[in-house]
Structure formats: structure tokens, C-alpha cells
């Protein structure tokens, strides 16, 4: 092999490495943008649903004790189930699959929560809401360790603070806007216009 051929081969390998590095950087940038969008949509969901769940429970006939149970069970079970996700991660579970499945279930559980007054007898509605909201909290908290680990690997350390600052700012603004909009919509409904 001549010196020119060796030089050309070396240059081609370096070009290939550079192209692969650029492709990887593009993938990471795309993933980070998707994560910001995910944060915005999750905040919208929370602003619309989480903020008004106690009012929804009252509309379903919940007592003060039941409202306390609704929020306390969710706050108990949610973090407890993070421990089981840690065990799954230690056994080699895919962080991406764990997060995606839990997030999907977290969003889908809102459908039966909203359907409660239409499909269940009045005397069971609050109990069903408590169970479903506990599941909602479990699915919200369960992927936390996997998501944090995944994002820690994805976000370069030199831009981590700036990135999460931007993501949290956007999520906060979306939460405020959707909470206010949901409040305006709910204000329209009087007791005689519900269910």
C-alpha cells in the first residue's frame, strides 16, 4: 500500500468518525427537544387534571375525609413504587421502555377517571376515584429514577443546568396557563350543568 493510499484511508476513517459523531450529536439534540416538549405536555396534563381533582371529588360527592384519603394515598403510593422501579433497573430493565410504558399508563388512566360519573353508581364513585387516582400517582412517580438516570446520560454535564432551567421554565409557564384555562372552563359549569 502506498503512502497516498494509507493517507486517503486514514482520512476516510476520520470522516466516518466525524459523521458518526455529528449524527450522534443530532440525535441527542433531537431527544433533548423532545424532552422539553414532553415536559410541556406533562405540565399541561397536570395543570388541567391534578389542580382540580379535589373539586372533581367534591362534585362526585366526596367528604372531607375522602378527599384527605384521595391525596394522602396518592402521595404515599407514588413514591413507594419508585423503589420497585429501582429494583427493575438494577435487574437490567430498559430505562426507555420503563419510562414510556409508565407515562402512557399515567396518561391513559385519566380516561376512566373522567368516565366515573357516566359508568358507575353514585355510591361507588368516590371509592373508584381514590383507587384510580392512586394508580395515576403510581404511574406518575414510578418512572422517576429511570427518567433521571436516562436524562443524566443524555444531557451533557456542561449544559445540564441551562437545559433543565429552560425545560423547567417552559413547564412552569405551561402549568400556569393550563391551570388558569381549566379554571375558566370549570367556572362556566354550575352544579346543574354537571353530569
Describe the residue ranges of each PLM region.
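Short, intrinsically disordered terminal tails adjacent to the first/last structured region
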Residues: 1-17
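Alpha-helical transmembrane segments of multi-pass membrane transport proteins
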Residues: 45-46, 77, 139-140, 152, ...
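Transmembrane alpha-helix termini and helix-breaking/packing motifs in multi-pass membrane transporters
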Residues: 51-59, 87-91, 114-121, 175-195
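Intracellular juxtamembrane helix-capping segments at the cytosolic ends
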Residues: 53, 140-155
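Loop-to-transmembrane helix entry/capping segments in MFS-fold secondary transporters
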Residues: 64-65, 96, 155-167
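Hydrophobic alpha-helical transmembrane segments
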Residues: 72, 106, 124-130, 162-195
Amino acid at each position: 500500500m502506498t503512502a497516498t493510499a494509507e493517507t486517503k484511508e486514514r482520512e476516510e476513517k476520520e470522516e466516518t468518525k466525524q459523521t458518526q459523531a455529528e449524527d450522534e450529536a443530532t440525535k441527542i439534540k433531537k431527544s433533548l427537544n423532545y424532552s422539553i416538549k414532553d415536559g410541556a405536555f406533562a405540565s399541561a396534563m397536570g395543570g388541567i387534571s391534578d389542580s382540580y381533582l379535589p373539586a372533581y371529588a367534591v362534585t362526585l360527592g366526596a367528604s372531607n375525609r375522602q378527599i384527605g384519603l384521595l391525596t394522602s394515598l396518592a402521595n404515599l403510593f407514588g413514591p413507594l413504587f419508585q423503589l420497585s422501579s429501582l429494583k427493575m433497573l438494577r435487574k437490567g430493565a430498559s430505562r426507555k421502555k420503563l419510562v414510556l410504558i409508565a407515562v402512557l399508563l399515567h396518561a391513559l388512566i385519566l380516561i376512566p377517571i373522567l368516565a366515573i360519573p357516566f359508568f358507575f353508581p353514585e355510591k361507588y364513585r368516590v371509592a373508584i376515584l381514590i383507587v384510580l387516582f392512586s394508580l395515576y400517582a403510581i404511574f406518575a412517580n414510578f418512572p422517576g429514577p429511570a427518567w433521571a438516570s436516562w436524562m443524566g446520560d443524555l444531557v451533557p454535564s456542561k449544559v445540564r443546568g441551562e437545559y433543565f432551567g429552560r425545560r423547567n421554565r417552559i413547564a412552569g409557564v405551561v402549568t400556569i396557563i393550563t391551570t388558569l384555562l381549566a379554571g375558566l372552563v370549570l367556572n362556566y359549569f354550575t352544579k346543574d350543568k354537571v353530569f
